[in-house]
From Swiss-Prot:
Its main location: secreted. GO terms for biological process: defense response. InterPro entries: Tryptophillin. Expressed by the skin glands. The keyword Disulfide bond does not apply. This is Tryptophyllin-T3-1. The modification Pyrrolidone carboxylic acid is found at Q1. It comes from Phasmahyla jandaia (Jandaia leaf frog). GO terms for cellular component: extracellular region. Belongs to the frog skin active peptide (FSAP) family. Tryptophillin subfamily. Keywords: Amphibian defense peptide, Pyrrolidone carboxylic acid, Secreted. It is found in: Secreted.
Length: 13
């Protein structure tokens, strides 16, 4: 069972 891993792309401003 795959775990829903969602990482939003955060860029240093």
């Amino acid at each position: 069972q795959d775990k829903p891993f969602w990482s939003p792309p955060i860029y240093p401003v």
